[in-house]
């Protein structure tokens, strides 16, 4: 009987954690992602206009956003719902638009900007989420 109970418990746990849902079926409430239909904090995988993993309502790991036509719009990493590490945004033609880094949800260091042909047009230097220097090419 114990083995059967353990089996069903593990099925429930795996099923709960491995839920996959379209991003449009989620909503933000108090800084957390909730399943719109059942109004519960979501844990699982998200696909659609944004793809990534959610743990206890917070984005985790690598995430990607997409234009309506399916081309990549942005890619970056999250830790407990905050942007961290390298962040890249793209023009609709697939060329990089901007690239920089986040730390604890805040832009830091040099952020570079590019035109639709991929030519660098500017750099902005961030400190404490504020642009301290702009350099135009």
Enumerate the language-model features and the residues they cover.
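Glycine/tyrosine- and acidic-biased, solvent-exposed loop/turn segments at the edges of beta-strands
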Residues: 14-137
């Amino acid at each position: 009987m114990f083995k059967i109970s353990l089996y069903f418990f593990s099925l429930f746990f795996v099923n709960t954690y491995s839920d996959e849902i379209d991003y449009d079926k989620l909503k933000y409430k108090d800084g957390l992602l909730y399943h719109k239909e059942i109004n519960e904090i979501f844990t699982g995988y998200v696909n659609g206009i944004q793809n990534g993993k959610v743990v206890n309502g917070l984005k985790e790991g690598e995430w990607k956003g997409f234009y309506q036509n399916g081309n990549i719009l942005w890619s970056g990493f999250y830790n407990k719902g905050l942007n961290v590490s390298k962040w890249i945004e793209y023009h609709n033609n697939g060329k990089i638009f901007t690239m920089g880094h986040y730390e604890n949800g805040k832009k830091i260091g040099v952020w570079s900007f590019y035109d639709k042909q991929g030519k660098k047009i500017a750099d902005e230097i961030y400190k404490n989420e504020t642009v301290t220097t702009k350099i135009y090419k």
